[in-house]
Amino acid sequence: MYLGAESTAREGGPAIAFRDLQRAWELLFLLTRRELKLRYQDTVLGFVWSLFKPLLLAAVLFVALKQIVRIDVEDYHLVLLTAIFPWTWFQTSVLIATPAFASNGALIKKVRFPRAVLPLSTITNNGVQFALSLPIIALVVALSGRTPSPVWLIGIPVLGLVQLALMMGVVLFISSLDVFFRDLEHLIEVVLQLWFYVTPVIYPLAIVPERWEIYLRLNPMTPVIEGWRELFTRNTMPAGELWPALLFAAAAIAVGSFTFQRTQGSFADAL
């Protein structure tokens, strides 16, 4: 059985390549829809749960850091909220996508299909949930005395695609290695916890001492998170953050794709 092409170039011309690419997108859509249904089919509130978790986390962090620790940051609730949702998209996608190949061994052995859609469907699934959070961000921004700008109509798709590309590279790399090193599933949980604190999610980069800022700038998620924050709180296209984010995304795609292409031929044997 064959659901998509992994050897299209030698089997046909551009028409076949286009057809198989279309099938891959259709399969990605079907997997994304299936994951969304399975995740919330037995719940009463459904998608509300995907919004409740980051909102609760933001509320707890606000009380702890603003009211107790007394962090001196203006409009700290916006600083938190505009970073928590895109970070949740990243963290949840990486965590769930890590065993995407390893947990689908039977499917990989029996069916030929574009295997990359397995981890990528997790990204798009969580991307839908991130999209549902955008009205909440807009509402909080408006209630804070600021007006959402038409710039958002450009900035949201641009930053969304950049973060999507970055995550695609990361999950292809990690999920490919997880087939051969199953301890990676446990290690990635610890890595993501540490990654959270070295990413300017609970604090803006502006308050970081200069001697430490250069190290945080080496974090691929730093320009992405700062970009979202600048877009939502300042209503400007974060050009200064966009170019580093694009470079990180391109590097991630290159490394992730290379790792996937070099290892996918051994998936069936390893599983």
Language model regions located:
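Hydrophobic transmembrane alpha-helices and immediately adjacent juxtamembrane helices
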Residues: 1-271
